Regions:
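Bacterial signal peptide processing site
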Residues: 10-13
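Short loop/turn segments that connect beta-strands within beta-propeller blades
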Residues: 74-77, 116-119, 183-186, 226-230, ...
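Repeated scaffold domains used in trafficking and secretory/extracellular systems
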Residues: 46-54, 87-99, 155-165, 195-205, ...
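Short coil/turn segments that connect the beta-strands within blades of beta-propeller domains
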Residues: 57-59, 99-101, 167-168, 209-210, ...
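Beta-strand-rich domains and repeat architectures in extracellular enzymes and scaffolds
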Residues: 40-67, 91
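A short beta-strand motif characteristic of beta-propeller blades
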Residues: 32-46, 78-86, 145-153, 186-193, ...
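C-terminal motif of bacterial Sec signal peptides marking the signal peptidase cleavage site
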Residues: 5-8
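Blade-level signature of beta-propeller repeat domains, shared across WD40, Kelch, NHL, RCC1
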Residues: 328-354
Length: 354
């Protein structure tokens, strides 16, 4: 079933006024850092420099840098003792599955999982004793403990976006195919969609199936996948240029509109709908849901800021802004309210405790 774009008829005069830059959003380059970053700045081990993404399940954090994923707590991060898991650099973004305590990645030969329990290997290997970059007795940088990813589902085509739902269903898409495969109980169902999938999330819902969303940056759309009947949902345009998407609370999705300088809150039951949009002072890329405060955090790369928003009945309200490290393209909010931000071009992770 093909999704239907939900949009009103646009008169030619309005269509002509649409910006040529619509779609294909990328992070706006950061200026040189002038102001001291807020909170604590932690240097990463060399193999985890230039972070491409962050995610978390509870207090366990996943730090991705190309072909390596570091897993552990903030304390292990501070001590330079994250457990490293090698992955194919061609694997897509990490998604979190709290129900099974594993981080999920779509890769060229299938969908892989990284259990949060691999963080225990740091203690098994001697605990959090060596700081990042500290030399071992032999004069070489101390080696980080390692673990291996687990193949959850072999696929006959490369996967670049994958999620595993609370009930155990696996949804697998690709940035160069117009379909999403669903794996359940050894059977595969293929859903036709209108555009390839650049990113996908599954958001738990109490007492029901997860809400699954996907985005395409070229056409700047967001679409829900009907989990119960394994079909494509409706499609909505995300402003002028969707950047990233992240889970919120109870089936909610949060998406940044990088070109339009705003973020949207999306909900779905039978059909996806836009709940509200909130303008941002800078150009947003990374976005995170703060479950403790029931608030939204957004990183704006063009001014090196991390902003906190309160959602209301209308549009959200900016509460405060923190100075960030350069090129903050990854952002998470932990259960205790701690905020982690990572640079895509540097070697640092920023820890903010509001």
């Amino acid at each position: 079933m093909m999704g239907v774009v939900l949009t009103a008829c646009t008169p030619p005069s309005v269509q002509e006024k649409l910006p040529a830059a619509m779609g294909n959003a990328t992070p706006v380059p950061s200026p040189a850092m002038v102001d001291e970053p807020a909170g604590e700045v932690i240097s990463l081990p060399e193999q985890l420099a230039k972070v491409t993404e962050l995610d978390h399940i509870g207090e366990i954090v996943a730090v991705r840098a190309g072909a390596v994923v570091g897993v552990g707590t903030v304390d292990q991060l501070r001590a330079g003792r994250l457990v490293t898991v090698p992955v194919d650099a061609a694997c897509g973004d990490i998604s979190a599955t709290p129900a099974s305590n594993e981080f999920v990645l779509g890769c060229p030969d299938g969908v892989y999982g990284i259990p949060t329990s691999v963080a225990d290997a740091a203690d098994d290997a001697g605990g959090a004793g060596d700081a990042a970059g500290e030399e071992s007795d032999g004069g070489k940088p101390a080696e980080l403990p390692t673990a291996e990813p687990v193949l959850l589902q072999a696929t006959d085509q490369p996967v670049t976006a994958a999620v595993k739902t609370t009930s155990g269903m696996i949804f697998a898409g690709s940035s160069d195919r117009e379909d999403v495969d669903v794996y359940q109980d050894g059977e595969k169902t293929t859903i036709r969609v209108e555009d390839p999938t650049d990113a996908m999330i599954a958001v738990p819902v109490s007492g029901g199936e997860d809400s699954v969303y996907r985005i395409n940056r070229r056409t700047t759309i967001i679409q829900n996948i009907n989990v119960a009947d394994k079909s494509a949902g409706a499609v909505l345009r995300v402003g002028l240029g969707v950047g990233t998407i992240t889970p919120g609370a109870q089936g909610m999705a949060l998406a940044t509109d990088t070109i339009g300088k705003q973020f949207g809150v999306y909900l779905t039951n039978d059909v996806i709908r836009l709940h509200q949009t909130t303008p941002t002072t800078g150009a947003p890329w990374a976005i995170a849901w703060d479950d403790k405060r029931q608030q939204v955090w957004v990183a704006t790369t063009d001014d090196n800021k991390i902003r906190r928003y309160q959602l209301g009945s209308g549009q959200g309200e900016e509460l405060e802004a923190y100075n960030s490290i350069e090129n903050t393209q990854s952002l998470v909010a932990l259960p205790d309210g701690t905020i982690l931000a990572a640079s895509a071009t540097g070697t640092d992770v920023q820890v903010i405790t509001p």
